[in-house]
Design a protein with these regions (language model features):
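Long insertion/accessory domains within large nucleic-acid-processing enzymes
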Residues: 262, 267-270, 404, 450, ...
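Helix N-cap motif at beta-to-alpha junctions
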Residues: 233, 285-286, 366-372, 416-419, ...
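Conserved nucleotide-binding/hydrolysis modules and their immediate coupling elements
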Residues: 209-314, 324-326, 337, 491, ...
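Canonical P-loop GTPase G-domain recognition
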Residues: 125, 135-195
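Conserved Switch II/interswitch segment of TRAFAC-class P-loop GTPases
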Residues: 78-84, 92-116, 120-142
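P-loop NTPase switch module centered on the Walker A-proximal segment
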Residues: 1-102, 106, 146, 215-218
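Interdomain boundary/hinge elements
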Residues: 41-44, 154-166, 200-211, 240, ...
Length: 609
């Protein structure tokens, strides 16, 4: 018989990038007494990965739990970026309700829509938390209207439309049920969660059933499966059967060696756990997302949503440039292969396969440029050295044999005086303008339907066009018929003619031809790209050239040569910049752009074909 666990609430926190959900979880942890009074707490404690802290984004879902009065609240912090949307869908299987965090100034953004749609489809209870209400330009009343409009657009039922609203400033540590209430602490949000989110239910006497929703990885115990116990209970040393809804051939008999629940930011070992609890199990070597842990006598798999397919791919290959192996710790094909396949343990939206017909090369597919650039940055920090190609979209074909390509819905906020150039550029990239509305502060919001490949390499150009004041957000929409060819880069490259060290005299002559990416003293090799040509063709330049010494005195003393500071490209800018016949060489210390074919004559022959 089904019973409710009134002492547990399972919630997910969902929001758009940078609307403050991780800060909100920090504040809930602090005010529930999870940390000791004298304990130093890092800001945004939930983002444990360096890149997450630096970029201010959440990449992997995190689990934590707090105790409020006598209720244990399991909280899952989900990524807000569309590239990590694969994480969100699965995590929602574990919870009975969501707290939707919306910025009091920015209002509803595309990712809010993406995640909310998933939550409403699964009939989850929603609490709307309007955050950052202490911002001077906050407009909470208008944002409430925007949210209700969004609910109606997403076909929410009456019960879902009648959701509670909470007004908060996670940074200042207070929440209110009404804008006129006293600004005290987070208690109104705690009460709202306990009173409005249903308790998990299940049958404690039935056979065990638990769906694995996320995978954690630990060097000591290996793979750890995390999920919610739907029925029955789990005990340490219990023998269970692993089955999978989409793959009936999976049937494995295994033993649970360790069982953990969550408390604060820590995993706590327990001997037994019952229905409604979110637990982690270790000791099962090849456990995967979507597997169901069942009792031996009645193994029934729980159905689950298949993970969204990747839309972009890049080739990762062994670095074969003349400077290969000088800066990295892990440089061989085996190192690269092991690291990429290890990433599959934790990142389920990723696909890795060996590139057919190409030695030492792996095709890595993901949900977007950010998804793959985070992987590249992580590997770089770990000491790996490799080369990557330009991102390409993954095409499908329909039943009539027509080519289909992934489409994105892009929301773009730009200053009013920049709208013309942005619309023109996106139209050239096969974008279709769907809507244009003025918003506060002299900005216009543009809505485009655009092929995913139209956005590859555009973000850097966009920031230049809007003088750094534009915001661009996009979410995957689906596959449509191929829209035709897009010409990407309008500029050619300045290519190094010979190998050696860059010298001021050579750079001084080269800088007249375009913008340089390198400074004096840097090592270069023939075929490496050292700058950008304002015209469309590639030009070879000799940056290692020295001044010829003669025994004739100069009529005027040599003037000191003045170099323009080089344009140093970040990882994202370099990935945006490279063309289809180029590679990005990634090492722990450097990023170098090069031609795929380094030799000048061989490259000339290949281009003539």
């Amino acid at each position: 018989m089904k019973t409710k666990r009134e002492d547990i609430r399972n919630i997910a926190i969902i929001a758009h990038v940078d609307h403050g959900k991780t800060t909100l979880v920090d504040e809930l942890l602090k005010q529930s007494g999870t940390f000791r009074a004298n304990q130093e707490v890092a800001e945004r404690v939930m983002d444990s990965n360096d890149i997450e802290r630096e970029r201010g984004i959440t990449i992997l879902s995190k689990n934590t739990a707090i105790t409020y009065k006598d209720t244990k609240i399991n909280i899952i912090d989900t990524p807000g970026h569309a590239d990590f949307g694969g994480e969100v869908e699965r995590v929602l299987k574990m919870v009975n309700g969501v707290v939707l965090v919306v910025d009091a100034f920015e209002g509803v953004m595309p990712q809010t829509k993406f995640v909310l749609q998933k939550a409403l489809d699964m009939n989850l209870s929603v609490i709307v938390c309007i955050n950052k209400i202490d911002r001077p330009e906050a407009r909470p009343e208008e944002v409430i209207d925007e949210i209700l409009e969004l609910f109606i657009d997403l076909d929410a039922n009456e019960e879902q439309l009648d959701c509670p609203f909470i007004f908060a400033s996670a940074k200042s540590g207070y929440a209110m049920a009404d804008l006129n209430d006293e600004k005290k602490d987070m208690q109104p949000l705690f009460d709202c969660i306990v009173n409005n989110i249903p308790a998990p239910e299940g049958d404690p006497d039935a056979d065990t059933q638990m769906l694995i929703s996320t995978i954690d990885y630990n060097e000591f115990v290996g793979r750890i499966g995390v999920g919610k116990i739907d029925n029955g209970s789990l005990k340490v040393n219990q023998e269970v059967m692993i089955v999978n809804h989409h793959d009936p051939s999976v049937k494995k008999r295994v033993r649970i060696t360790k069982l953990y629940t969550f408390n604060g930011l820590n995993k706590v070992e327990v001997n037994e756990a019952g229905i409604g609890e979110i637990v982690a199990v270790s000791g099962i070597a090849d456990i995967h997302i979507g597997d169901t842990i069942c009792s031996l006598n009645n193994p029934v798999a729980i159905p689950f949503q298949k993970i969204s397919e990747p839309t972009l791919s890049m080739d990762f290959m062994v670095n074969d440039s003349p400077l290969a192996g000088k800066e990295g710790k892990f440089v061989t094909s085996r190192h690269l292969r092991d690291r990429l396949f290890k990433e599959l343990n934790t990142d389920v939206s990723l696909r890795v396969e060996e590139t057919p017909g190409v030695e030492n090369s792996f095709k890595v597919s993901g949900r977007g440029e950010l998804h793959l650039s985070v992987l590249i940055e992580n590997m770089r920090r770990e000491g790996y050295e490799f080369a990557v190609s330009k991102a390409e979209v993954l095409y499908h074909t329909d039943e009539r044999g027509k080519k289909l390509e992934p489409m994105e819905l892009a929301y773009i906020d730009v200053p009013d005086d920049c709208t013309g150039s942005v619309i023109q550029k996106l139209s050239q990239r096969k974008g279709e303008l769907l809507g244009m509305t003025p918003i506060n502060g002299g900005y216009t919001r543009l809505q485009f339907s655009i092929p995913s490949r139209g956005l590859i390499g555009y973000r850097g150009e966009f920031l230049t066009d809007t003088k750094g004041n534009g915001i661009i957000n996009s979410s995957f929409e689906g596959y449509e018929e191929y829209k035709g060819d897009i010409s990407y880069r309008k500029n050619g490259s300045l290519i190094a003619y010979e190998s050696g060290d860059a010298i001021t005299y050579g750079l001084f002559n080269a800088q007249e031809r375009g913008t340089l990416f390198i400074g004096p003293g840097e090592k270069v090799y023939a075929g490496m790209i050292v700058g950008e040509n304002p015209r469309t063709e590639d030009i070879e330049v000799n940056v290692c050239k020295t001044k010829h010494l003669t025994n004739t005195r100069s009529s005027s003393a040599d003037e000191a040569l003045r170099l323009v500071p080089p344009k140093i490209l970040s990882l994202e800018q370099a990935l945006d910049y490279i063309d289809t016949d180029e590679l990005l060489e990634v090492t722990p210390k450097s990023l170098r752009i090069r031609k795929k074919i380094l030799d000048h004559t061989a490259r000339y022959r290949a281009n003539k074909k």
